[in-house]
């Protein structure tokens, strides 16, 4: 599937490449759903994890309820996975696994309503995810919004929700940011370049570093 975060032999460059493959086609989708999950790692339902993660339930419960220490004070964890926990990325991936399948079942089916690999993706719905960052492509804004609602239902079962402010539908001609890169079409040509936010962060790091070394 097209999930690239915290997986062996996969990285952000692979996710960017998949976006390029999808968006550079001559009949590429024009609409993008930019997904943003509110505090994904902090709000995953413990009940859902204990019911669906295939591992020893007692060990998993101890890990989830271990809490964290900050300034010598113990803070309990009633939801989410411990920040910095060694298996937290795996649990997050397993929680979000299934979004792509849900979209395929809805948009990649044949006339009989069954998933068919030979069926042409007329809706141009594609899914790319890196950890809790994801984008969905679509042929129309209406299809993108339909995909948004399917994902919202999927996340709700797991104690998660989309940010309405940051989850937006964008036309490829206006461009969108994903994993530190900006994707936009100019005169039918796809241009991928570092996002303004990423460039600003790099410039800030350089300006902070050079004065210190000059002292």
What are these regions (language model features)?
Residues 158-215:
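A conserved non-catalytic segment of reverse transcriptases
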Residues 2-175:
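Conserved polymerase palm-domain catalytic core
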């Amino acid at each position: 599937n097209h999930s690239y975060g915290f997986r062996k032999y996969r990285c952000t460059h692979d996710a960017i490449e998949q976006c390029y493959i999808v968006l550079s086609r001559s009949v590429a989708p024009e609409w993008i759903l930019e997904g943003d999950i509110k505090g994904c790692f902090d709000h995953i339902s413990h009940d859902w994890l204990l019911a669906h993660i295939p591992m020893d339930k007692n060990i998993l419960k101890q890990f989830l309820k271990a809490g964290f220490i900050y300034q010598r004070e113990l803070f309990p964890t009633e939801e989410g996975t411990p920040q910095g926990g060694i298996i937290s990325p795996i649990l997050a991936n397993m929680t979000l696994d299934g979004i792509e399948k849900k979209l395929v079942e809805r948009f990649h089916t044949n006339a009989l309503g069954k998933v068919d690999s030979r069926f042409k993706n007329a809706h141009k719905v594609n899914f790319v995810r890196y950890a809790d960052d994801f984008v969905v492509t679509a042929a129309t804004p209406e299809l993108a919004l339909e995909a948004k609602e399917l994902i919202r239902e999927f996340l709700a079962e797991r104690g998660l929700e989309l940010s309405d402010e940051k989850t937006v539908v964008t036309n490829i001609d206006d461009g969108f940011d994903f994993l530190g890169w900006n994707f936009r079409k100019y005169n039918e040509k796809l241009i991928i370049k570092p996002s303004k936010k990423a460039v600003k962060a790099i410039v800030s790091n350089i300006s902070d570093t050079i004065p210190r070394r000059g002292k």
